């Protein structure tokens, strides 16, 4: 359990390192990184893993990606550009490692998630892999990211800590709102979401409940759920305080949600509502999301012949399919 905790801390620093680096590139200045900016970190890792897998097996770059994330995290620490409660972040890390330590891997992860991750790790994108097994054609960016971090430290593979890291950031963000006296809608929504997850897990008859039982598995169900909830939170946050940075985070989080699990496509209604209300995303974020979507669609087409598998209307006839 101790080694799992140490490796989780390593992955958290990698995500925060990429979050700081992404913000530096995007905003052209080294502004402070907050807990909610983990969205930037995951987005940049999604984008990087997708882009690299077009050309090389991801196992060739896993170590270098981890090292870069850690180094940029340390650089940002030295520059004092983090505005994050690291004490609560560490405490939540310990909590989730403790409750998930002996749960084992879920059935779906054993059946096909691990195989999908290993294929992306060992090979470039494989033409028509969805024809071999439909599950391999499910184009989840989360699994592509897991393929990028398919590497062991201290006998612990990072892929088993991915969703634990996400839950840690999520709960840490909620803890920031507990001390606020006059709680706004975003605070209330986030706190109630945490209360529901914990209550459901506490009263569920089977171990930690079907939500927290997924911790430690490279699955997409709880991951997409957290991204979905966080998208709604960012939506309320922007409504409450029309800050452009929150608007950018919302669009990135919506992309993370949909590209992790396509069944959450309904979340795109949130940015549409904002556009109808007269709010517009800037050109830079539009180009970034468009490029990320382009890579995701092309990857899906190469793997299955469909832009969005298994939606048949998105399939394109070709001589190779």
Stretch-by-stretch model annotation:
Residues 101-104, 145, 284-321:
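Membrane-lumen/periplasm interface segments of specific transmembrane helices
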Residues 55, 102, 152, 218-219, ...:
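Transmembrane helix irregularities
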Residues 1-80:
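Membrane-embedded, hydrophobic transmembrane alpha-helices
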Residues 184-226, 234:
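Aromatic- and kink-enriched transmembrane "portal" helix at the membrane-lumen/periplasm boundary
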Residues 97-192, 213-217:
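Active-site lumenal/periplasmic loops and adjacent helix-entry segments of GT-C-fold
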């Amino acid at each position: 359990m101790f080694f799992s905790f140490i490796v989780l801390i390593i992955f958290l620093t990698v995500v925060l390192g990429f979050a700081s680096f992404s913000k530096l590139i995007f905003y052209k200045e080294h502004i402070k990184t907050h807990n909610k900016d983990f969205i930037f970190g995951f987005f940049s890792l999604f984008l990087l893993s997708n882009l690299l897998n077009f050309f090389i097996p991801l196992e060739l770059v896993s170590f270098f990606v981890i090292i870069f994330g850690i180094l940029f995290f340390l650089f940002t620490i030295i520059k004092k550009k983090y505005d994050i409660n690291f004490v609560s972040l560490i405490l939540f890390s310990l909590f989730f490692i403790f409750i998930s330590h002996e749960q084992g891997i879920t059935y779906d992860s054993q059946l096909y998630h691990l195989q999908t991750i290993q294929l992306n790790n060992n090979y470039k994108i494989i033409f028509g892999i969805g024809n071999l097994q439909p599950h391999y054609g499910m184009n989840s960016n989360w699994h592509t990211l897991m393929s990028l971090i398919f590497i062991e430290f201290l006998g612990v593979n990072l892929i088993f800590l991915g969703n634990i890291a996400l839950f840690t950031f999520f709960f840490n963000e909620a803890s920031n709102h507990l001390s606020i006296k006059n709680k706004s809608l975003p605070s209330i929504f986030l706190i109630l979401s945490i209360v529901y997850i914990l209550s459901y897990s506490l009263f569920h008859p089977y171990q930690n409940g079907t939500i927290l039982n997924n911790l430690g598995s490279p699955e997409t169900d709880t991951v997409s759920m957290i991204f979905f909830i966080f998208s709604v939170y960012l939506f309320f946050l922007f409504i409450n305080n029309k800050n452009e940075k929150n608007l950018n985070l919302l669009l990135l989080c919506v992309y993370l949600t949909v590209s992790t699990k396509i069944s959450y496509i309904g979340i795109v209604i949130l940015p549409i509502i904002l556009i109808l209300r007269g709010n517009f995303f800037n050109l830079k974020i539009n180009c970034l999301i468009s490029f990320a979507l382009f890579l995701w669609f092309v990857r899906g087409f190469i793997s299955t012949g469909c832009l969005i598998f298994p939606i048949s209307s998105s399939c394109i006839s070709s001589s190779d399919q």
